Amino acid sequence: MSMNSAQARVLDPILTQHARGYTNAEFVGHALFPVVTMPTRAAKRIEFDRSSFRRRRTRRAPGAPIAALEFGYEGKPVALHQEALSAVTPIEHQQEAGAVPGIDLQQVGVDTVLAVIAMEKEIQQAEVARNAASYAATNKDALAGAEKWSDPDSDPKAQVYDAKEVIRKRIGRRPNTLVLGGGLTSALGKHPLITAHFRPTNAAAISLAMLASYFDVESVVSGDAIYDQADGTTVDVWGGDAILAWVAPAGQRQMPLPSYGYTYQLQGHPLVEQARFDADIRSWKNDCLDEFSAELVGADAGFLFQDAL
């Protein structure tokens, strides 16, 4: 009997466990798209509309059937993307590292590959969040001139409060997360209205916690990641945009709540396969794989500020 790919795959349990616990503090996409696992690649995502906010008849007469209500609806199929790279450890490097206590070159190589895959996940999450076509006209604003938060005459707080009210009227909850492009974070730290607000505190700098207090949201995170294109051009992953959203709390992410987005990840991933020796290059190789897709499932729960920088 032939084996399928899942049965044939031999995992390195220690490195796989390490991979599943791997995090990179520089990446913030999970703040908008928390990870939920999928048992299979063939599944459809649950999307959210305004049906959960419609007034329903709940009163029941004796002997009458009980009304039923289903939240959300089965939406588009989730197309998981497989990201795969091999961590290569030349035996010469391994021999040299063996003379130094505490150095595990195999794990170092896996960490390097995991960082590359995590960057790809961050880029995909940012692309989904920054796609203006995914938002209703009421839930986005392309800023220009004195509206830009980098302009000293702008009023970011008023704009955020207006956006919070848009989201509240769409989903009945106030947003709890604000993601800022890295350059935008720096600009807000110098904005005259914000520095004047915190001047009595004698703070040396405007922190993210202070911005969260200023905008009255639970969490403000700064998307500082960059990457280089093939031509050498450096790209700011989150650009000069800001995304305000309501994201389901950690204990409620399996429930049909109108959360902004999720990263659907195949169960058992990421994984690291057992090392194999490649005689042609005299190196050990560990294949690292992950399968995921960042999905905007509740655009009503978000607001996109385009070109705020």
Feature names for model-found ranges:
Residues 88-94, 181, 203, 207, ...:
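General structural signal for secondary-structure boundaries
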Residues 91-174, 182-195, 308:
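Alpha-helical scaffold segments that mediate packing/assembly in large oligomeric complexes
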Residues 73-98:
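Short acidic, glycine/tyrosine-flanked loop/strand segments centered on an H-E-D-like triad
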Residues 2-60, 74-83, 146-155, 195-309:
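Sequence/fold signature of self-assembling virion shell proteins
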Residues 71-72, 171:
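Residue-level detector of transmembrane insertion/anchoring sites
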Residues 48, 62-69:
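Hydrophobic, aromatic-lined core segments that form the binding pocket/scaffold
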